[in-house]
Amino acid sequence: MKEGFAGLRGVALVVCASLVAGCVAPAISATSGLNGIEHILVIYAENRSFDHLYGLFPGANGIANASPRLYLQVDRDGRELATLPAVWRGKNPDPAFPAGLPNKPFRIDAPPINLPLSAPTRDAVHRFYQNLEQINGGRNDRFVAASDAGGLVMGYYDGSALPLWQWAKDYVLADNFFMAAFGGSYLNHFWLVCACTPEDHDAPAELRAQLDE
């Protein structure tokens, strides 16, 4: 579960995304093979990790495959956290989440929290440098430490009531889809389509990033 809602290292490095791909109207042609496909739709779920919504999907590489080696989070100095930090709502702890949650994934829509999918929660940070720190060389153990939402990044839902869940059953669910670029989904949209980073060589000076060396 990684990215905006991050969490399980190794299990879902889908930092920023779950992917559902399917062929529209799969029975429209008797032609076999690729020639029988008229359209392919890709649903790229922005700012979501795989486990955040699909961690309980039957047969998927999700929560059931998690082990402490894969999900335990550390602080910025590399020390294992005894418990998850508070879940933040603005500048204060969110009263909907109890303090001292165990250092592991937790259900948001189950006791003791019981927040439904319809309840808004904080949009966790999903920027380039924070994401680089969160992934931590592939260990994926600093999503909590480098988050502005505290322990929320380890939360997940039972997504079976969502229409997306049924679409995943009807078509294809990519449970080992990995993002191509650090940060949010906008840049990853380009990488999904063209495996490239867009550049504006004619951008005015005030819009160009200046590197301090």
Can you describe what each PLM-predicted range is?
Residues 3, 20, 32-33:
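A general, composition-driven signal for non-globular sequence regions
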Residues 10-22:
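Bacterial N-terminal signal peptides
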Residues 24-213:
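N-terminal pro-sequences and low-complexity stem/linker regions of secreted or lumenal proteins
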Residues 1-12:
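Bacterial N-terminal signal peptides that target proteins for export
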